[in-house]
């Protein structure tokens, strides 16, 4: 758990990312979701996972970053909220986007416990804090938070109960 206390606003945005992950699951996708919020508290991007559509790079975070950077490059003051700790690929996308703050719900460690038997979501045994901690510019990594809520879209999914 992070030592940083989340504000009610941050918790509300994190819950919105978790809702996006549930929407992805409801659409037959893997249950991951994220939103990007600007410095004026506007949700400027929302994206769920699209990997089952055939493109393994279409994780929620890479989709959101890819879509927003087509129209906006000034993301330093934005926060990315994600239902689950980003993988190495998504952490790289966050770094390259210039986003300087990321908050996540479910930890990579707890995700691995859920997914390891399915073979659909092979784990990388490295967390986003280690990856983003090596960045050339500071990126605040906050989480895990409200894991009891963030895990709900995953319950039963990885053991075939979609």
Swiss-Prot record:
State the compartments where it is located.
Cytoplasm; Nucleus
Species in which this protein is naturally found: Schizosaccharomyces pombe (strain 972 / ATCC 24843) (Fission yeast)
User: Catalytic activity, per the record?
Assistant: cytosine + H2O + H(+) = uracil + NH4(+)
Name the pathway: Pyrimidine metabolism; UMP biosynthesis via salvage pathway; uracil from cytosine: step 1/1
> Its domain of life?
Eukaryota
Q: What is its EC number?
A: 3.5.4.1
**Name of the protein described by the UniProt record:** Probable cytosine deaminase
Q: Which UniProt keywords apply?
A: Cytoplasm, Hydrolase, Metal-binding, Nucleus, Zinc
Q: Does the keyword Zinc apply?
A: yes
The record's GO CC annotations read: cytosol; nucleus
List residues of the CMP/dCMP-type deaminase domain. Answer: 8-132
Q: Tell me which family the UniProt entry assigns to this protein.
A: Belongs to the cytidine and deoxycytidylate deaminase family.
Biological process, per Gene Ontology: cytosine metabolic process; UMP salvage
SUPFAM superfamilies the UniProt entry points to: Cytidine deaminase-like
What residues form the catalytic site here?
Answer: 61 (proton donor)
| Role, per record | Catalyzes the hydrolytic deamination of cytosine to uracil or 5-methylcytosine to thymine. Is involved in the pyrimidine salvage pathway, which allows the cell to utilize cytosine for pyrimidine nucleotide synthesis.
Query: What molecular functions are annotated in GO for this chain?
Result: cytosine deaminase activity; zinc ion binding
User: Which cysteine pairs are covalently linked by disulfides here?
Assistant: none
What positions does the entry give for Zn(2+) binding?
59, 87, 90
> Which sites bind substrate?
159
Q: How does it assemble?
A: Homodimer.
């Amino acid at each position: 758990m992070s030592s940083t206390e989340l504000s009610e606003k941050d918790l509300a945005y994190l819950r919105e990312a978790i809702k996006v992950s549930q929407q992805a699951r409801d659409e037959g996708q893997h249950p991951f979701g994220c939103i990007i919020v600007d410095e004026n508290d506007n949700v400027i991007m929302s994206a769920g996972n699209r990997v089952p559509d055939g493109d393994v790079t279409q994780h929620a975070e890479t989709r959101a970053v890819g879509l927003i950077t087509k129209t906006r490059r000034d993301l330093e003051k934005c926060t990315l909220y994600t239902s689950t700790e980003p993988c190495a690929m998504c952490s790289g996308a966050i770094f390259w986007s210039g986003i300087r703050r990321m908050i996540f719900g479910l930890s990579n460690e707890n995700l691995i416990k859920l997914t390891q038997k399915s073979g659909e979501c092979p784990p990388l045994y490295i967390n986003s804090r280690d990856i983003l901690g090596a960045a050339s510019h500071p990126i605040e990594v906050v989480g895990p938070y409200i894991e009891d809520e963030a895990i709900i879209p995953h319950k039963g999914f990885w053991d075939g109960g979609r």
